[in-house]
Amino acid sequence: KNKNKFLQSIETKILILGGSQGSKSLNLILPKALLNIEDLFIKHQCGKNNFEETEIIYQQYANNNKVEIIEYMDNIHEYYGWADIIICRAGALTVSEVSASGSLGIFIPLPWAIDNHQFFNAKHLKDLNAGFLLEENDNLEQDLIKILNDIKKIEIEKLQIMKENSYKAYIKNPEKKIYDEIAAI
């Protein structure tokens, strides 16, 4: 039986999404955390006004990882298909897209989102063993390093189950379900 581990002896592709505007806090914290993990190919969507600042931070914390910084991704579905792991916020659309792509998500909810809805979006997938949830606080950098190191120790089969759970959590044909509910009234 193949017991190969994820993130070992292969280049792991990580997609970082901070939303269409980017996330200054993720842009500052994630390059430092990812410095501690080797053999990564990172594509980081930083937001239109954050490119230079994000590039400087990656240069400051450079290691052997390949990094591509992108202001905005027009064809986001191609990036979802490319990634092994997606590190992102937990807005409803982003969580749905990660699930629909069957990707493994590490969700970092926006801490000041109304009614903490991003936390609950991410918690739903975490509770289904379909993703990881990290809270944005003073420990975020260390928590992310720990999760990525923990992922290194998990068997590929278990990670594949998490990806499958993520895809199963995606609500298929939501417009039909909404229509049916309205029509039933």
What does each model-identified segment do?
Residues 171-185:
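C-terminal alpha-helical cap of glycosyltransferases
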Residues 157-172:
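A short, well-ordered alpha-helix in the C-terminal region of glycosyltransferases
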Residues 81-96, 103-104:
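Acidic donor-binding loop of glycosyltransferase active sites
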Residues 72, 92, 110-114, 138:
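Short, acidic/turn-prone active-site loops that include or flank metal/cofactor-
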Residues 128, 132-157:
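C-terminal "capping" alpha-helix adjacent to the active site of nucleotide-linked donor transferases
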Residues 102, 119-131:
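Acidic, glycine-centered active-site loop in nucleotide-sugar glycosyltransferases
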Residues 3-88, 119-122, 134-143:
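Donor-nucleotide binding loops and adjacent catalytic segments primarily
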Residues 88, 104-115:
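Short hydrophobic beta-strand element within catalytic cores of glycosyltransferases
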